[in-house]
Amino acid sequence: QPANVDHLLTAHGLMMSEILTNAGRFRDKAVGIQKGKEVHHVAPPAHQVSGLMADLTQWLKQAKDHPLITSSVFHYEFEFIHPFSDGNGRMGRLWQTLILSQWHPLFLSLPLESVIKDHQQQYYQALEDADQQADSTPFIHFMLSVIAQTLALNAPVNATLNAPVNIEEMKTPEAILHLL
């Protein structure tokens, strides 16, 4: 269940057990994101992580927005909190896929992670833009674009094989729903 903190911790433990000594536990130290010597994001203090993650999963349980939006907001907030000492990006992307797959099982087989990797600089830029604006909208737009592109490349239900795809027109939840 994506709205269950214990499931999140268990998944992190399974994913990171060969890499981290504290896999499956929230971080107990300050962390930030640096590019060279420049700090781009300072995560909330470690003593706040447990409460922030409880708040985030509670929000997820009660979210009324479309799953495309909800999953993107969750992903952004998760990355902002940066709850683990390592593996936050992997976990955030995995959890977004999990949220989306509960809405539509097709997302279990879509390579969102691969498309994000192909656009890694834009991914980090969208996170940074959202941080600077104190608004998750830039990140939501980026993720909708990635989802639309992934669907267009892997599940072109209503298109012929040679039809051009306009990614800009596919960034809305309605356009993505049409692909499903």
What do the PLM-derived regions correspond to, one by one?
Residues 1-180:
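FIC/Doc superfamily catalytic core
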